[in-house]
Amino acid sequence: MGDGAVKQGFLYLQQQQTFGKKWRRFGASLYGGSDCALARLELQEGPEKPRRCEAARKVIRLSDCLRVAEAGGEASSPRDTSAFFLETKERLYLLAAPAAERGDWVQAICLLAFPGQRKELSGPEGKQSRPCMEENELYSSAVTVGPHKEFAVTMRPTEASERCHLRGSYTLRAGESALELWGGPEPGTQLYDWPYRFLRRFGRDKVTFSFEAGRRCVSGEGNFEFETRQGNEIFLALEEAISAQKNAAPATPQPQPATIPASLPRPDSPYSRPHDSLPPPSPTTPVPAPRPRGQEGEYAVPFDAVARSLGKNFRGILAVPPQLLADPLYDSIEETLPPRPDHIYDEPEGVAALSLYDSPQEPRGEAWRRQATADRDPAGLQHVQPAGQDFSASGWQPGTEYDNVVLKKGPK
């Protein structure tokens, strides 16, 4: 069993028993393919006696392998082991290897089952395995190549294929510059083409070929999957076309985008620095002449300037000796203002000085009778004649025609 074995060790296989599932230990040997043998995984039963109706050795052909994936935490395994899946066309095997060796077993099986392709381990069971994808080196370049091959394919339903209304069987052709899809109700009709420089990734497995189109394709971006037994041939044809296109492409330098400085330079401004740090004016720089100012209006002159001009005028008239005026900014700091008169109701009753209404008198009527008594001084009475002449009471001329007339004042 040791001749030509790529890897050997112990693996556990989960088997269905009468009363449930049970793990059994096997000696495992992994063999690569040759001209006289197929790549395979052999599980040899241990020294314990095999059960009846069970073969002592199990052989798993790696050419029938569809996927190899690590099992998640939902799959229980023996102590100090980790489980992984090995799916073939006939059945699904659940194997377990020592935790430190599971990665080596999975990688070795993948290299023999899918030669020449980089493997991407899928997630836990229940997630659909995706074909391993390879980056396209000509994505977004602009060169054409010349392979021309045709392959019969069947479209698998995906989001991109449903958007393009692609269903059924078609012919996939590797053209000179693009991957072309031919078919439809009329023969010889090209439905879509995907330029090689716009294909992001492409991959294949035993029964599937798929690629991811860029957004600049006519179909739009998305994944397209095809069922075909010629997946490896399509992959090699595409790889050959892209390699030839890459070798024929001239090495043109990519234009570098203009770099934007982190901080833009700012022109020097005299207001951005202190007054003491301003540089002296250059002798070669002409000094701009001051602009002539128009006649200022009356309200444009500050009040202190108006006060100074009025003070000069009044000084000449009143002959008052001139007084030094303080700076208008500080002229009211220490100025002594006269005290404001107190309000009449601010003083307590009986303390304030007597005013006009502090000595009321009782009104008396018939002022004409009281003021015309004989004890009054007749020298204070005056009469105004129509001619505008004034005479005192003692100088009246007796026996005149109008000595009886009394002038009365009308109401105001």
Curated annotation (Swiss-Prot):
UniProt keyword annotation of Phosphoprotein present: yes
Residue ranges of every copy of the PH domain listed in the record: 4-114
Modified residues (Phosphotyrosine): 271, 299, 345
Record's compositionally biased regions (Pro residues): 277-291
UniProt tissue specificity: Highly expressed in peripheral blood leukocytes, lymph nodes and spleen. Lower expression in thymus, bone marrow and fetal liver.
Post-translational modification summary for this protein: On immunoreceptor stimulation, phosphorylated on C-terminal tyrosine residues. Phosphorylation on Tyr-345 is required for binding to the SH2 domain of NCK. Phosphorylation on both Tyr-271 and Tyr-299 is required for interaction with RASGAP. Phosphorylated on tyrosine residues by TEK/TIE2.
Coiled-coil region(s): none
Molecular function GO labels: transmembrane receptor protein tyrosine kinase adaptor activity
GO biological process entries: cell surface receptor protein tyrosine kinase signaling pathway; cell surface receptor signaling pathway; Ras protein signal transduction; signal transduction
Phosphoprotein recorded as keyword: yes
Region (Disordered): 246-296, 359-412
Similarity section: Belongs to the DOK family. Type A subfamily.
Oligomer status and interactors: Interacts with phosphorylated RASGAP and EGFR. Interacts with RET and NCK. Interacts (via PH domain) with TEK/TIE2 (tyrosine phosphorylated). (Microbial infection) Interacts with Herpes simplex virus 1 (HHV-1) protein UL46; this interaction induces DOK2 phosphorylation and subsequent degradation.
Domain notes: PTB domain mediates receptor interaction.
Name under which the protein is recorded: Docking protein 2
